[in-house]
């Protein structure tokens, strides 16, 4: 084994943070230094050249001075017997660089901790430095040699039920954490008695997973008695009622990994499977929809819990039908009180938590990063979500209880697209090859399905921790590329049947695959790809290693499938074959036995149906009188409540422009304020139709009136989706995610009544269908605190997500108030008809109360009429701004509109209140409704339309937006409240700032927070030196010649499709080229005029951003020669964007005239930054930017490592003086800046784009390919038509070629 020292592992900021954490828990720690340590398992001595290549490979990341370490060594390495994702990718790169003697590379972090540490101190330090699920701590570097030793496989064990009977099974139930119910134990005893043999541990674990509440939804399929009355429908039956009442527009419901609804016809853009040239295929583009929860893992380990939650939901979408494509995501969190140190709020009363779970604050610091990181690396924009905190001590008939979310809700969902012919699964033929696609088996996530079905606290802490999975999004991206190549073959798609691997691992996925396909299966355990050879059969078969799919491919199609996998470098293995007989057999060639051999009927058949006998309990609540509250204090408290406050910290970490199909994200207007009501995507690049999604949830109401909370969740989803041009209300389809603490007094009945209110009453009345959903029935946390029993129980929680096809994405309404449209009015539409009920409101919560009467959907006809009128007014162009009323009430809706419009507001409340005592209820009640801005001249017509729809009593003109900074509320001729907008916006933003300060570079967080004080900030703006509508490439396109441009990608790249679309629009033939094509000699760059390296996460960025990709070119003779020859040609051009920019900056030795180019390293904020930033085009040599110099315009930014690090001050000066700096960040005032967030990565002198001296090669961190259409821009001027400002760049390249 070779040991190679690496660069320092922590930036100054991260170092300071970790040292602070360590000293807080172990005061004896006085200092810390950390560096990477690399270990190479070699088959022979390396030559001097090979040593040099290896040394260069392992030199990556920012240039930080290396120290001579001192202190006690804590070497954190992957667990022995495992292969980390870093190792597999780095080893791939080494092989591609010709280092054949390197069997494997692995990496650890060597922490040198200074201080007089006792053994107990050392144990505490070690615990805080590693993830015990995937890592261990050594005290010497040489100990890492054990990383490369291979453990012997552990054997199978049997449970002696024939001899030991029920007691043996009960013992196994506890030891293995199976969570089997009494009747399931009876069932297993009977089944194995009939088989005449003892069950193996693997069979019991498999049964427990497949039949867990998590997988089987026993409560939703149960029979019910409530108060002694038999109920005639199951919960699931009542949900299905919505489909039975209205099937229109639903293509697949309740039977696949996601539901499918009807979309629009468009030109679906992808490469031709034969020629590899991108083109549009005109066809129906159907919409798939799915929302999952990952609550249990997120409570234990928030980053991997939320990350794998998003990853699992993405796999659900990809594994729908015969293969589909995920498109846009959403994330939601509900947690208990945050209690941010130094920022504790008056309503937050500390209650404690069990050791096994993390705090609500930890969840909100780490969890969103996990969800965002997976979406970012996979390449899916995260476009909407929600965040709520709730934790309150309340009086009940059984005494005081704490209700809240110590077991959090972590929601991951999204939508995608699927071809019409692939909506339904195909047939599994006898003899079909059964395949595992994706990553290897690892000993992680064991028993996750069963664990998430228990109340937190009912299992041991070790089992809890073992049930959390770990993530590798780059692997999932490779799998998706394989699935994409398959569905793009149309009728020749080799996939006949596909499922994702989730809860229960292969033990759930493979039986489900063959069972759903009407077959049995014969499997070989040792064929399963396995990175931990020491695992037992149970561990191989049941672990929940992520990024895997199971599928069936007919023998005749196997070579096609194999070739696709090899080109995409995606691991796969044939693990079995389909058989006629409905038997499940798993053979183990190592031990020459059969760990599993049972009829599918025993595993998935007639397990006993659950019966619930429950009673209703009195509704809860307390008296809450808002009349006497001080208005200013109430406004400030409400604005600081996380459900109301800015969600910016959740949003800027997630890429919102990837795909180039995003028409409406969370950030609104020139000031990019996070207040959008819904997310909207375009169907494709050639149409204005699209898809919308939005969420609704009002969970605290369930403590007072559970059915009302369900109705309000649906109502809020409708009022949010009303902002999109949907058409008719019945076009909306819902996903319903149900959470409850089953078994807690009164909760089962509340759940039943809520499902009934939604499924049997409101949805049928609205004509809305719920074709998909999920349930989590163990929302309770129990623990002991110094001998005292404690528990936190969540309310019945329905989270609703609505999806709908959109007629015109350009007509998506936003809350941004407009001052450039003449005199205007604000109109309130109050669907509560003046009731202004405050029960369960944020106002009540911030004063430590619940209240009693809650908002409700009193009349479905009102909601239907509201939706129809808003859609009509939008179609007619009457609505300038729209915002629904929700958490925080009317005052919050109006303030958020003012924040987005950067203006003041004059409100007149005379029409809304009969007395001053009623003002608090008017301002803070959360009844359904909306505020719209219309031109003053259109107000009579708008009011008349509402009146004609029967909503006369619901509408009132309540004020006007005004120039300036003042928010004034007037009643009976006097001003009852006045405040400056910027002060209120800072209060609204402070919760987000406080979390950002803890999580990211605190200096950057402070700069962004202070930027809100700039009243004169003009926002985003456009100043062009060219005509955006002038198609300078048109004369060349008319010649019919389409020069070829290689759209180059490496494994992990995810931005190729929109890049191809931009070049295609400019008149190029865009060709899909994978690095594997070049390394194998299938493609020669001589055939191309242009080469574009696209954005993404090549090799998961394991050897530095873009560096592994670059080095696989530099140190591979064939690739190096090909690229060097291409760059030397005077008729060639190249572009590198984001990851492609990072990669090309490392190829400067091959690209003439680029010796001064920088290296791109971690952003100064230490965070992935996804923003719309202003850039100025410089006078430069770049062929792409000719005629654009002096232009200032917004552009999409999405990167974690975009800081330009020059080799020296001289190199920076050389770049500046050479005329090769092509783009710089500027602030909204137009000045070049290094200040955050206008310069999101902190690059010196705002530099974010450069070119070679002759201008043929340009690199840039921003993404022009995502905003070449006007409609792709988060904000755009009203006079832009089809073309966006950045299309000129691609047209310039087309002109240059001729």
Curated annotation (Swiss-Prot):
SMART domains: GATase_5. Pathway: Purine metabolism; IMP biosynthesis via de novo pathway; 5-amino-1-(5-phospho-D-ribosyl)imidazole from N(2)-formyl-N(1)-(5-phospho-D-ribosyl)glycinamide: step 1/2. The keyword Ligase applies. Residues 298-328 are annotated as: Disordered. One of its GO terms (molecular function) is phosphoribosylformylglycinamidine synthase activity. It comes from the Bacteria. PANTHER family: PHOSPHORIBOSYLFORMYLGLYCINAMIDINE SYNTHASE (PTHR10099:SF1). This is Phosphoribosylformylglycinamidine synthase. It comes from Pseudomonas aeruginosa (strain ATCC 15692 / DSM 22644 / CIP 104116 / JCM 14847 / LMG 12228 / 1C / PRS 101 / PAO1). The gene is purL.
């Amino acid at each position: 084994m070779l040991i190679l020292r690496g660069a320092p592992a922590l930036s100054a900021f991260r170092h300071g943070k970790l040292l602070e954490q360590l000293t807080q828990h172990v005061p004896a720690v006085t200092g810390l230094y950390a560096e990477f340590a690399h270990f190479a398992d070699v088959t022979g001595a390396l030559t001097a050249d090979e040593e040099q290549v290896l040394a260069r490979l392992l030199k990556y990341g920012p240039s930080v001075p290396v120290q001579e370490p001192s202190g006690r060594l804590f070497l954190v390495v992957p667990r022995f017997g495992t292969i980390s994702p870093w190792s597999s990718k780095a080893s791939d790169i080494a092989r591609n660089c010709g280092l054949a003697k390197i069997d494997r590379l692995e990496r650890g972090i060597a922490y040198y901790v200074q201080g007089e540490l006792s053994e107990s101190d050392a144990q505490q330090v070690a615990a805080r430095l590693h993830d015990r699920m995937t890592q261990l701590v050594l005290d010497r570097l040489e100990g890492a040699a054990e990383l490369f030793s291979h453990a012997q496989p552990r054997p199978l064990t049997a449970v002696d039920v024939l001899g030991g009977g029920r007691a043996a099974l009960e013992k196994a139930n506890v030891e293995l954490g199976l969570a089997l119910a009494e009747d399931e134990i009876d069932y297993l005893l009977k089944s194995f008695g009939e088989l005449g043999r003892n069950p193996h541990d693997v069979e019991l674990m498999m049964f427990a997973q497949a039949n867990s509440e998590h997988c089987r939804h026993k409560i939703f399929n149960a029979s019910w008695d409530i108060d002694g009355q038999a109920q005639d429908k199951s919960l699931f039956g009542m949900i299905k009622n919505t489909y039975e009442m209205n099937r229109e527009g639903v293509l697949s419901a309740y039977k696949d990994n996601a539901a499918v609804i009807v979309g629009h016809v468009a030109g679906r853009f992808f490469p031709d499977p034969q020629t590899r040239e991108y083109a549009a295929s005109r066809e129906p583009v159907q919409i798939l929809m799915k929302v999952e929860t990952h609550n249990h893992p997120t409570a234990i380990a928030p980053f991997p819990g939320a990350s794998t939650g998003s990853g699992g939901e993405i796999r659900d979408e990809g594994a729908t039908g015969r293969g589909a494509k995920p498109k846009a995501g959403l994330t939601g969190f509900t947690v208990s009180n945050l209690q941010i140190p130094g920022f504790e709020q008056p309503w937050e009363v500390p209650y404690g938590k069990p050791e096994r779970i993390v705090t609500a604050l930890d969840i909100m610091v780490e969890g969103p990063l996990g969800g965002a990181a997976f979406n970012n690396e996979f390449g899916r924009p995260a476009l909407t979500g929600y965040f709520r905190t709730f934790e309150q001590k309340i009086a009940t008939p059984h005494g005081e209880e704490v209700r809240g979310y110590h077991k959090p809700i972590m929601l991951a969902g999204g939508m995608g697209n699927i071809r019409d012919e692939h909506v339904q699964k195909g047939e599994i033929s006898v003899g079909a090859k059964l395949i595992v696609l994706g990553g290897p088996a690892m000993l992680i996530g064991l028993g996750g399905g069963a664990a998430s079905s228990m109340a937190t606290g009912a299992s041991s802490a070790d089992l809890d921790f073992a049930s959390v999975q770990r993530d590798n999004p780059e692997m999932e991206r490779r799998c998706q590329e394989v699935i994409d190549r398959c569905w793009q073959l149309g009728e020749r798609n080799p996939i006949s049947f596909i499922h994702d691997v989730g809860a229960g691992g292969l033990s759930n996925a493979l039986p489900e695959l063959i069972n759903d396909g009407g077959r049995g299966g014969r499997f070989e355990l040792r064929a399963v790809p396995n990175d931990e050879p020491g695992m037992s059969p149970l561990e191989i078969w049941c672990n929940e290693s992520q990024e895997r799919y199971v599928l069936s491919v007919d023998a005749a199609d196997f070579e096609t499938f194999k070739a696709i996998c090899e080109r995409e470098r995606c691991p796969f293995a044939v693990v079995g074959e389909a058989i006629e007989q409905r038997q499940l057999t798993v053979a183990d060639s190592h031990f020459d036995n059969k760990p599993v051999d049972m009829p599918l009927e025993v595993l998935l058949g007639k397990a006993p149906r659950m019966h619930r006998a429950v009673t209703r309990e009195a509704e809860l609540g307390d008296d809450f009188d808002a009349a006497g509250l001080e208005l200013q204090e109430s406004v400030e408290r409400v604005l600081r409540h996380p459900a109301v406050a800015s969600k910016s910290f959740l949003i800027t970490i997630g890429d919102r422009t990837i795909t180039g199909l995003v028409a409406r994200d969370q950030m609104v207007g020139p000031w990019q304020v996070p207040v959008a009501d819904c997310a909207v995507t375009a169907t494709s690049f050639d149409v204005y139709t699209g898809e919308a999604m939005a969420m609704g949830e009002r969970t605290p109401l369930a403590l007072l009136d559970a059915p009302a909370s369900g109705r309000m969740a649906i109502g809020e989803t409708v009022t949010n989706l009303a902002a999109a041009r949907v058409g008719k209300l019945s076009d909306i389809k819902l996903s319903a995610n149900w959470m409850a603490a089953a078994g807690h007094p009164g909760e089962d009945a509340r759940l039943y009544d809520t499902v009934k209110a939604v499924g049997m009453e409101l949805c049928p009345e609205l004509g809305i269908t719920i074709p998909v959903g999920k349930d989590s029935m163990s929302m309770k946390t129990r623990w002991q605190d110094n001998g005292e029993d404690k528990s936190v129980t969540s309310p019945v929680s329905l989270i609703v997500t609505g999806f709908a096809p959109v007629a015109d994405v350009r007509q998506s309404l936003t809350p941004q108030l407009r001052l450039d449209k003449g005199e205007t009015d604000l109109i309130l539409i109050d669907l509560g008809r003046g009731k202004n009920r405050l029960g369960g409101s944020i106002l009540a919560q911030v004063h430590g109360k619940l209240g009693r009467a809650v908002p409700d959907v009193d009349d479905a006809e009102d909601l239907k009429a509201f939706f129809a009128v808003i859609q009509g007014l939008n179609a007619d162009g009457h609505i300038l701004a729209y915002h629904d009323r929700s958490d925080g009430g009317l005052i919050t809706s109006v303030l958020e509109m003012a924040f987005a419009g950067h203006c003041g507001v004059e409100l007149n409340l005379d029409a809304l209140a009969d007395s001053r005592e009623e003002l608090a209820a008017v301002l803070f009640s959360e009844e359904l409704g909306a505020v719209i801005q219309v031109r003053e001249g259109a107000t009579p017509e708008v009011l008349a339309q509402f009146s004609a729809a029967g909503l006369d009593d619901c509408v009132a003109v309540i004020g006007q937006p005004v120039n300036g900074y003042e928010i004034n509320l007037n009643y009976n001729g006097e001003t009852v409240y006045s405040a400056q907008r910027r002060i209120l916006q800072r209060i609204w933003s402070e919760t987000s700032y406080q979390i950002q300060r803890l999580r990211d570079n605190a200096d950057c967080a402070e700069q962004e927070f202070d930027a809100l004080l700039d009243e004169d900030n003009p926002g985003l703006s456009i100043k062009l030196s060219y005509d955006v509508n002038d198609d300078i490439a048109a004369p060349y396109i008319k010649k019919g010649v389409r020069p070829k441009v290689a759209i180059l990608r490496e494994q992990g790249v995810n931005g190729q499709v929109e890049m191809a679309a931009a070049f295609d629009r400019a008149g190029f033939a865009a060709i899909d080229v994978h690095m594997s094509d070049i390394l194998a000699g299938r493609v020669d760059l001589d055939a191309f005029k242009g080469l574009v390296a696209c954005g993404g996460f090549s090799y998961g960025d394991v050897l530095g951003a873009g560096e592994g990709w670059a080095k696989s070119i530099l140190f591979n003779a064939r690739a190096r020669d090909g690229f060097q020859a291409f760059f030397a040609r005077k008729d060639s051009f190249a572009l590198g964007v984001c990851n492609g920019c990072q990669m090309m900056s490392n190829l400067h030795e091959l690209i003439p005239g680029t010796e001064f180019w920088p290296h791109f390293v971690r952003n100064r904020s230490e965070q992935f930054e996804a923003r719309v930033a202003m850039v100025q085009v410089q006078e430069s040599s770049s062929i792409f930017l000719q005629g654009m110099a002096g232009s200032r315009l917004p552009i999409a930014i999405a990167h974690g490592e975009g800081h330009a690090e020059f080799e020296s001050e001289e190199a920076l000066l050389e770049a500046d003086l050479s005329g090769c700096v092509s783009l710089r960040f500027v602030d909204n005032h137009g000045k070049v800046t290094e200040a955050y967030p206008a310069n999101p990565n902190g690059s010196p002198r705002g530099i974010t784009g450069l070119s070679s001296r002759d201008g043929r090669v340009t690199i840039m961190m921003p993404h022009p390919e995502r905003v070449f259409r006007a409609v792709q821009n988060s904000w755009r001027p009203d006079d832009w038509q089809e073309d966006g400002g950045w299309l000129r760049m691609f047209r310039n390249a087309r002109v240059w070629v001729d």
